[in-house]
């Protein structure tokens, strides 16, 4: 007989299931049977089951027709289990290597349940461990740590009712209250004595799709004699970073969720002692849900169900709570619940209004920057839209550049006086042709977000912006995609784990999206899930590369920057790495290219123009490289820099798509390509066979390629021409004109 029976239901998302099995195979504890219960899967997983059947002691069961749900799968697992202990594992989650081993050691204390640590993540195991190493804690896990810090308890717990031992019951209450895995009544992350489960006939109610855990866990907690907390037994609960296309069960949007929650609470109450600790905690859970979540919907939601049917439904559920549950709530929350029990809708709304008002006051008190948002929502958004106002923004107002710059200048020159143009810019930038400049996230900025008719942005709009009827949003984006974007990414390792969810809402506000080539059109449709109008005219920022006076512009810029006339120029433009960041929109960067070696070998003929991505927060130290390295990372317009560059070196930045319009040499310094390709983004094209230049892995190879640049040009001549036809086919110097004529009619 195996020691542990791991019960693993599977319904869908094969790639998550594969990672779950891969991680389980790395467990240091091997004495377990794996019971896989199939819930009529929609994907073919026979290959996975065959592969891991040779690794695990695996038994596979399928739910009968007409039976479905994780509750039914787990009940089958319990019935078929032969191990001394039970462990529930969801197919999109994973455990760390020593988790099971550490739990088994704890079972030597002859307890009925070992309670492990339940951590949350949006990432696969490798990226989760990377974040743990860098002390980046999920916000849900941070909340639990704070709760446990405030209430330190003994590891051993004996659950008792008030009738038996009031003091012990009070201690048990704090234990349940501060261990989230228990407090939320999830079965995950715990190891159960199978004899204890079978003897008491604990089962999951199969009528509940979303909230069956409490129907198993609450009766179990009430019967539990002893349990032990093990801090180094970690279960990782994975939140899906694409809740639009691949929602986890907890992320599914279903009209029935609300009623099921109430039904599950009411059913579970019937299984519990009315005066017991578990019943107390269950009641407090539903009250907290009403006070913190549902009450706001009663006031704010546009769906009247929250003020009619749902209001009555939650009131019926709250009617069953014990009076002492309310003792720990503040006065306004107590009044809110009392109003609910009296079916006083206006009273509840008044309490919510007071609660939100106090919350806003403290938000403003702590951070006065929220004031402009309040002004946006409550004042500016009520003003009429001004039909002649256009708001421009590039790279979160960091500079005056990119496609919005060229669209603006075309409008300013060709429609003088017709439009009031406003630029969002920080750091005191000046804009030609008389545009008004406002600072991003200022009152003026909020005002123009509310009243402008047109918007021309090259990145996403602020999350707090809400497009009004009649407004027109032009998204130019900022490059042909090499790296996989948004919904084409399996793993999101950037600073915002809700990236896909946020992007999905933001892209719904775009009326136009600019495309530089047919490849971009197809890719944007996929990665942005964009169904709106495409402006297939090329990038306005590339217009300058076709202007008849481009050589004069280049000559003037070289003189302005102090670049010697007798030196050729090498543009080095690296991008950022998703997993190396300080915070939202601020990325770390360590310069891997040996500029000192380049100076030693190339300075007689070349100088280097260093231009890092606008997301990179680090300032690159070029001490000792004066006269050879010109750091142009703060120079606004990279399109102008292209004009003075004889060679471009990049990695995974999209700059080479634009630079190729000049048909000048491109080198790729891809020292970390395997990590970038396999762990981070992945690519849309094969860099080994499709990019217009060689992949180089060391600084020495880069130097050698530059010294032999004529040979490189000849070697990649045909590939470069194919690349140019494929990716530069829309650019002709007139993109700004075409876009202005179509949008600003």
Which residues fall in each region the model found?
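Short, acidic, metal-binding catalytic loop of nucleotide-sugar glycosyltransferases
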Residues: 22-31
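Glycine-rich, basic loop-to-helix element that forms the pyrophosphate-binding segment
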Residues: 64-81
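Short aromatic/hydrophobic "clamp" motif used to bind/position activated sugar donors
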Residues: 86
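Donor-binding/catalytic cores of nucleotide-activated saccharide
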Residues: 94-231, 235-256
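Membrane-interface aromatic/basic loop that binds lipid-linked glycans or pyrophosphate carriers
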Residues: 299-383, 391, 409, 413
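A nucleotide-sugar donor-handling region in carbohydrate enzymes
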Residues: 373, 482-582, 719
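Conserved catalytic-core segment of nucleotide-activated headgroup transferases in glycan assembly
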Residues: 399-413, 527, 540-622, 696
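Catalytic binding pocket for nucleotide-activated donors in carbohydrate/polymer assembly enzymes
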Residues: 654-727
């Amino acid at each position: 007989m195996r020691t542990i029976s791991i019960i693993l239901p599977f319904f869908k998302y094969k790639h998550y299931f594969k990672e779950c099995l891969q991680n389980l195979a790395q467990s240091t504890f091997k004495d377990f049977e794996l019971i896989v219960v199939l819930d009529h899967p929609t994907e073919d997983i026979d290959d996975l089951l065959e592969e891991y059947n040779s690794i695990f002691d695996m038994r596979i069961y399928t739910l009968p027709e007409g039976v479905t749900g994780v509750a039914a799968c787990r009940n089958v697992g319990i019935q078929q289990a032969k191990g001394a202990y039970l462990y529930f594992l969801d197919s999109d989650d994973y455990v760390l290597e020593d988790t099971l081993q550490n739990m088994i050691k704890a079972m030597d204390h002859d307890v009925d349940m070992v309670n492990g640590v339940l951590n949350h993540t949006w990432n696969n195991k490798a990226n989760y461990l990377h974040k743990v190493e860098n002390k980046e804690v999920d916000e849900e896990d941070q909340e639990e740590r704070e709760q446990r810090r405030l209430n330190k308890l003994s590891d051993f717990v004996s659950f008792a009712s008030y009738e038996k031992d009031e003091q012990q019951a009070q201690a048990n209450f704090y234990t349940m209250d501060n261990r989230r895995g228990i407090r939320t009544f999830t079965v995950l992350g715990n190891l159960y004595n199978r004899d204890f489960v079978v003897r008491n006939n604990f089962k999951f109610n199969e009528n509940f799709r979303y909230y069956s855990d409490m129907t198993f866990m609450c009766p179990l907690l009430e019967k539990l004699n002893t349990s032990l907390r093990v801090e180094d037994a970690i279960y990782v609960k994975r939140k899906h970073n694409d809740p639009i296309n691949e929602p986890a069960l907890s992320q599914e949007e279903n009209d029935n969720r609300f009623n099921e929650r109430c039904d599950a609470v009411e059913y579970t109450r019937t299984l519990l002692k009315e005066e017991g600790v578990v019943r107390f905690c269950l009641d407090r859970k539903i009250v907290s849900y009403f006070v913190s979540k549902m009450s706001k919907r009663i006031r704010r939601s546009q769906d009247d169900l929250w003020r009619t049917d749902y209001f009555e439904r939650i009131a019926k559920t709250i009617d069953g709570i014990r009076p002492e549950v309310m003792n720990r709530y503040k006065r306004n929350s107590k009044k809110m619940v009392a109003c609910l029990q009296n079916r006083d809708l206006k009273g509840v709304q008044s309490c919510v209004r007071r609660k939100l008002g106090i919350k806003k006051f403290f938000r403003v008190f702590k951070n006065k920057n929220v004031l402009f948002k309040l002004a946006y929502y409550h004042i500016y958004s009520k003003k009429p839209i001004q039909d002649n106002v256009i708001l421009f923004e590039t790279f979160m107002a960091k500079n005056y550049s990119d496609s919005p710059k060229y669209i603006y200048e075309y409008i300013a020159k060709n429609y003088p006086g017709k439009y009031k143009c406003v630029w969002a810019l920080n750091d005191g930038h000046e804009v030609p042709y008389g545009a008004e400049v406002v600072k991003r996230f200022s009152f003026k900025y909020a005002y123009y977000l509310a009243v402008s008719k047109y918007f021309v942005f090259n990145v996403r709009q602020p999350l707090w912006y809400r497009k009004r009827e009649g407004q027109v949003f032009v998204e130019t984006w900022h490059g042909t995609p090499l790296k996989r974007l948004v919904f084409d990414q399996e793993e999101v390792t950037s600073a915002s784990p809700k990236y896909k969810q946020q992007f999905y809402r933001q892209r719904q506000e775009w009326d136009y999206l600019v495309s530089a080539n047919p490849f971009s059109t197809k890719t944007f449709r996929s990665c942005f899930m964009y169904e709106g109008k495409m402006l297939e005219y090329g990038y306005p920022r590339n217009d300058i590369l076709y202007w008849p006076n481009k050589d004069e512009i280049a000559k003037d810029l070289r003189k302005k920057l102090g670049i010697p006339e007798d030196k050729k120029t090498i543009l080095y433009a690296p991008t950022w790495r998703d997993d190396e960041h300080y915070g939202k929109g601020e990325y770390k960067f360590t310069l891997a290219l040996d500029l000192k070696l380049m100076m030693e070998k190339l300075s007689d003929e070349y100088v280097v123009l260093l231009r890092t991505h606008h997301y990179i927060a680090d300032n690159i130290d070029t001490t000792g490289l004066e006269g050879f390295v010109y750091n142009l990372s703060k120079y606004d317009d990279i399109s102008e820099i292209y004009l003075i560059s004889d060679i471009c070196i990049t990695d995974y930045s999209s700059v080479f798509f634009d630079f190729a319009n000049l048909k000048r040499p491109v080198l790729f310094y891809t020292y970390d390509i395997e990590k970038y390709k396999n762990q981070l983004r992945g690519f849309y094209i094969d860099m080994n066979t499709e990019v217009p230049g060689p992949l180089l892995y060391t600084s020495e190879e880069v130097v050698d390629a530059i010294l032999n640049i004529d040979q490189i040009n000849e070697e990649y001549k045909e590939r470069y021409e194919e690349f140019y036809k494929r990716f530069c086919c829309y650019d002709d110097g007139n993109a700004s004109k075409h876009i202005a004529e179509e949008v600003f009619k």
